Amino acid sequence: MGFFDLFRRHKSFSHGGIYPAEHKELTASQKIRRLPFPPTLAVPLSQHKGAPAQPLVKPGQEVVRGEPIAAAGGFVSVPMHAPATGRVMAIDLWPTAEGPKAEAIIIDVHEAATQEVLYGMEVDVLALPPAEIVAAVQAAGLVGLGGAAFPSHVKMTPPEGRTIETVVVNGCDCEPYLTCEHRVMLEQTDQLLLGTRIAMKATGAKRAMIGVEDNKMDAVAAIRAKLPAGEKAITVHAVEAKYPQGAEKMLVESLLGRQIPEGGLPADLGVAVYNVGTLAQMGELLPQGRGLIERVITVSGPGVSKPGNYLVPLGTPISFILQQLGTAPEANEVILGGPMMGMATASLDVPVTKGVSGIVVYEAGNPDQEQRRVYPCIKCSRCVDACPMQLNPSMLGQLAQTREYGRMETDFHLNQCFECGCCAYVCPSNIPLTQYVRIAKAINRDTPKDDG
């Protein structure tokens, strides 16, 4: 960090946001370590936005680590690959973080297997034409690893009439406790930069802007140190450490000074946004012709004996991870993702999927996690001030309580909310505004629209 960086106010979005306790000191200095393979893997066929993957294997079939086991179910879909060598036990319903069970391929992992990845063929990715790169990205099963899990190749093919001029690389890692992206930027810098160049080639973008929160200046320095002297196409920018800086709309505004229009996409501004973890995997897997079979996650929180950043096979049950880290799972509350936007899980059989960036564990009875009494809204407007989308969470909450879900959408821009949790965090009445929004969206999705 330079001397003047100590005093410079870094870029940020224009409205709202909060400064929650970060708790990143628990794992920020912990290098990425590999966890053992579990005896059983459960690989859901829907780990991404879009159509579920379609099984290519049958019960009783032997599979090799890296082998395709499910094909993409359409353009907005990605394939699945075997995270370990083993035998397919079943294709059955399995618990998920979202609540309902979903179809998954259950693999009995061979203990004696070497677990080498035997699939793949080396290729000079940057020598390929853009269309072949897009196809390779889909074939690798790559999705947004920051949590959204949107298929990465779809962002490389913008709607007709749109062109991509800028690749925005999201290195904010803004959720409390989570540091997996921080460690990726420090330890997989070469892969990250190669993935960035691959994304630029595929989209036709002339420049890339890497945004990193200013509480991770070591990552800023690490990336800049790897750039060639005089590099102008790829630039690294420190942005203010303010939640939710890592949200797509917020980071685009912070870096470009432009807002994505309501109901619009980054492509409307000529932008494609990728997470640093996604691009690091792109730079790692595509040159080897391999698929995504594992990811880095942060395991942290007051209920974890050995917090850290771990490389785990996709499909690993949470229960196995917690056992490996010396945690008694029956005594804790477990959240998949970060405490702001993550989901508490009712079953520890839920597996790690492509969109899971962390596991936060709270001790039973932790006062921060105890059910708190909800009081009436006092019209303090703290939620309005905190909302980065400039919505009126107070009014959304009142309409939710009277079950006027349609008005929430038509009159108060319900679908503009991306459920960051800022409003609920600052509410002195403990009103669960984020949960109200999620319920309203779910009900509206299931309610037939009146064409009249």
PLM region spans:
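Short, well-structured beta-strand-loop connectors
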Residues: 58-71, 90
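N-terminal, Lys/Arg-enriched amphipathic/low-complexity engagement segments
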Residues: 1-56
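Hydrophobic alpha-helical positions that pack around
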Residues: 206-318, 324-329, 338
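Acidic low-complexity segments
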Residues: 90, 95-150, 161-162, 217, ...
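Histidine-anchored nucleotide/phosphate-binding helix
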Residues: 186-202
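Ferredoxin-type iron-sulfur electron-transfer modules in oxidoreductases and energy-metabolism complexes
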Residues: 357-374, 382-384, 388-452
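Gly-rich Lys/Arg/Thr-decorated short loops/hinges at beta-loop-alpha junctions or inter-strand turns
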Residues: 115-116, 144, 167-181, 303
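Conserved hydrophobic positions within beta-strands
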Residues: 86-88
